[in-house]
Amino acid sequence: LMLTLYPSKGLDRVRPAAAADYFLRGGLISWLSNTIIGIVPVARDKAGTGVDVLEPVRAALKAGDIVLIFPEGTRGDGEEMAQLKSGVARLAADVPEAPVYPIWLQGAGRVLPKGEALPVPMNCTVLVGDPLHWRGDRQAFLGELRARLEDLKAKAPPQRWA
């Protein structure tokens, strides 16, 4: 869904951060994830083991790629925003020249529910906010990002399926 927001000319620079344990588990999904989509794999199963699971994302940002990140650490369930994880703030601190654009996706959970393989034809609303830049404080950054996401959510049209 997010890849459709970008012109095809620069699409090779747009790379979703994605769970390596899911998208690189083998077979067709691994091939599609690497060859067609060009994911930045995040080894979330190694978090807390001393391995820097964000290093591939950091490297992609430093290389000038546009990396799509769900700041909750996953795409979540339904239309509710989960607690934001610190990873997005750590990346902003490490690569301050890379702006963070808050994006609110309304209806994405209905188009491709978590655990499903095939999308369901349905309309989605995508709202993109002004860029957020690192200013030196992790909690302030996360608070501002959350406030901007909540503002975008409030601007979204009413859900017709509710």
What does each model-identified segment do?
Residues 129, 144-149:
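A conserved mid-domain beta-alpha-beta active-site/ligand-binding segment of alpha/beta enzyme cores
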